């Protein structure tokens, strides 16, 4: 834990405007996986991982950082606008090869093939990979709204939920019954 605290202190000392915290995922096909598999590296126990996370958040808060999203903290005014749009169920347009978008109720990606991308641009058509288009039922979209909204420290607004899905409060009474 001392090494972790020292690392967080060094990060805070550098005063970046934004800090992201992610737990290491040991995945097959990576160098870390090989080290782990060969017994040359240990995985951090889940309880210790959570302690490290909460310790870092406390240290960052003390240094003036605001924990605004499950894995991000920022100095006031430096929150990631893209992340907040995503977690707030706002539309966004991805530009470039393989970029993701959410617009008009659909989720889609641009082609990641340069030739197809350039051809589409020259022909003035969207460079969307047609196989990537995802349209969900309203019930599924409601679940996505809740799930992504819960990534934010403030959670999500039922008023915003009602507005997005044009639902009256009676339709969301089930959601409210699950509040702590």
Placement of each model-derived feature along the sequence:
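C-terminal scaffold of the Radical SAM
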Residues: 1-167
